[in-house]
């Protein structure tokens, strides 16, 4: 009995020691893996020593490693070689200690239920995710566990696995507080699975220990143990169901991987930035990552990566947090068909053709409404300074590209091409103007063709600088800032392609505009469609400055010479060899060269210098012209020929020919006379009001003088009348006095 009471006291002291040392603080929310690992190692070493003692004593007082959650403080007290003592024949103090122990167990059971519910609810979101790397790791951990009863090694491995798993996944790092709350209860859930598998493998031995313990347990302890075992059985059933679900999901995942291998996908769906373990978790078939964190495992991983020819499929755990990278990375990694690639390549080549030799201008808008209006109507208005600049660029450049950006938006809103110069007087466009600015301050309206209506963030163009704006980033600039050709081209190519735009029509417009502009301004060479005219075959009228009208020519048909009434060409009529005058003309005193090529003033001067014309018929040749006194040398000889010898041998022309020739050649003179008269009339009409004004101005002083003289005469007459009246009055008064 003395030995039994001593053993009972030792057991109670062990239980109290476990309670005081191993119960974690429930309010502590931080998880320290090192301190937890130290506690687990102490606990494992105690269990190992106690088990060895129980084997040495041939299981006289065997202990039980009950299948309970390690997170419960009850498991540590039950598994530490507990001595079951009946309450019969105990003292009052011992009985009170037993009651205190039972109340503490019940409290801990209630706390464990709450913690278990919270931990299970925190794990559910991870199970519902489509990616299943965490489930595969759990299965691999269960396979990799050895059946050895060394609890300290298993617990250390589990802690290392938890640490490496948290470092591999950014999601698990974000949710480390939830995992920490699970660990605060005293141990990790994975060690619970290790104890369960150990109990399954050593089932026979545990059954014997349980039978011996039940025989020795008291009534109160049996009730507590039965309640705990029922809860543990329920938890085991839940865990088995979870494990079955995990195994099914693992099989589905492995089947998917086999299908992908059979299809022979030789491309890498992994982004270059996701190679680091902190962003993604990668898997390989036939390999298990235990996450032990040792150097050997790291070397094996590196060797596997070098030996592998096909890149592994990497599952991005970031989920919905990658909202910005969705548009870029999703399109990069999706496998495009050859037709889609060809269409995009064709679009890029067309865009490069449009941007070739273009001029680029940055357009800054004050609000999104104006840009939306421009996208809808295809028009734009700017200040007169920029309007003049854009008009000059449109005339000189092949294309003018406007890159739009709303102030303080952080993005470019698209780019368009000018399709016309600015025009005024059309239907007004209701722009949204800032305070203090009226629509009259804007210039004309440009028509534009949009090339891309999609947006481009400034962050995508941070590497581009504008040499024409002091090498500042291309996003910086005032409204109308011109961008250098290479910089503008690269900026436009950064925009996402806009499939709603038909670049073929835009190219057609460009060619039409270039053709229209090339026709009026041919640079030194005639166009292909314009007939080439030989410069050497120009008519002499083209060189005549004074001859603004085309002179009539008489071109006779070849049969004209055989007519019976044929007369010689009047252009070759006889010319007086002495005076070089055209004979028998109406104005015969005018020289031929003056008559043909001289101006009207020369003609009038010659006409006034000569005498009156001769009569038409019945008179000797040249009777009205005074013959100059003959030189003695020419008295008996004919005078020498003059300047035009070919005309000297012709005979006199009859009157009909002279009249016909006169009708032709007098046309010009009649026109000149008509113009002179009309000009005189018009100038006279214009001069008449001037002359009237001058006459009025001249007459004004005369009229003023006349008026003044009249006024003076009237004043004189009035004074005379007054004087006469005075004299009369005086005379009459004198008469009355007498």
Curated annotation (Swiss-Prot):
InterPro entries: YTH_domain, YTH_prot. There is a cross-link at residue 96 (Glycyl lysine isopeptide (Lys-Gly) (interchain with G-Cter in SUMO2)). It holds the Pfam family YTH. One of its GO terms (molecular function) is mRNA binding. Residues 63-90, 186-197, 283-292 have a biased composition (Polar residues). Ubiquitous. Residues 358-495 form the YTH domain. Residues 1-341, 512-566, 618-654, 680-738 are annotated as: Disordered. The modification Phosphoserine is found at residues 35, 118, 120, 146, 311, 318, 320-321, 323, 427, 438, 548. Residues 198-257 have a biased composition (Acidic residues). GO terms for cellular component: nuclear body; nuclear speck; nucleoplasm; nucleus. The modification Phosphothreonine is found at residue 148. GO terms for biological process: dosage compensation by inactivation of X chromosome; in utero embryonic development; mRNA alternative polyadenylation; mRNA export from nucleus; mRNA splice site recognition; mRNA splicing, via spliceosome; post-transcriptional regulation of gene expression; primary follicle stage. RNA binds at residues 364-366, 380, 431, 479. Residues 318-328 have a biased composition (Low complexity). This is YTH domain-containing protein 1. It comes from Rattus norvegicus (Rat).
